[in-house]
């Protein structure tokens, strides 16, 4: 599908996403992401757009898109539209020329976590935006305050954001941030958190070695 490679309007972006909608896939996604009553994704709306299709739309979004337009997408009821907004933020963050531009995206992201409300939305964005920013652009004390705020948050998704944010450090061979977070969230009540922590611990094993991983597990789990 052809579309303008300089898109700056939320309405234009959403229109293209809607053109990719597939009712059958929407039904499957609604089940997969637990949108039923009492489930973690209760009430979320899917239109059946595949992630590669969302990414193809993001490629056509201008780096000059105003955050006010991204906000319209992020506040949308449709899940894939919110995913698109987050992938746009990732694009803006990665293409940012300096700390100031990165901070602008990071601040916007952290002020809108109520809309980052499913595991895929967290997992496609947190390690890039939050992980890099708090690691590379915050002093130790500021970083610790931020991490603790997300650890004690009553929001499942903010809890998951801080776990996934540690992936940035893990990939650099530093597992300390994850171990700090994991120690405090190991007994979280939600299975999605157990899965997130387990995933990050496996990444530690791959990057820092089984010995490092087993020392943590022996001390905290066994």
Residue ranges and their predicted role:
Residues 2-222:
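Alpha-helical scaffold domains
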């Amino acid at each position: 599908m052809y579309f303008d490679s300089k898109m700056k309007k939320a309405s234009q972006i959403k229109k293209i996403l809607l053109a990719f909608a597939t009712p059958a896939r929407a039904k499957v996604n609604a089940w997969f992401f637990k949108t039923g009553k009492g489930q973690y994704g209760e009430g979320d709306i899917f239109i059946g757009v595949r992630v590669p299709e969302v990414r193809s739309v993001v490629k056509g979004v201008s780096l000059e898109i105003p955050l006010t337009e991204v906000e319209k997408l992020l506040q949308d009821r449709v899940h894939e539209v919110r995913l698109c907004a987050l992938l746009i933020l990732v694009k803006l963050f990665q293409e940012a020329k300096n700390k100031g531009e990165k901070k602008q995206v990071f601040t916007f992201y952290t002020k809108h976590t109520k809309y980052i409300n499913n595991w895929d939305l967290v997992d496609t964005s947190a390690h890039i935006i939050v992980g890099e920013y708090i690691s590379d652009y915050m002093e130790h004390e500021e970083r610790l305050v931020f991490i603790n705020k997300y650890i004690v948050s009553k929001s499942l998704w903010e809890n998951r954001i801080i776990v996934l944010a540690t992936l940035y450090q893990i990939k650099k061979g530093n597992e300390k941030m994850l171990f700090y977070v994991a120690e405090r969230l190991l007994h979280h009540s939600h299975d999605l958190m157990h899965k997130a922590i387990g995933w990050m611990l496996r990444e530690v094993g791959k990057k820092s070695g089984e010995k490092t991983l087993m020392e943590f597990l022996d001390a905290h789990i066994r």
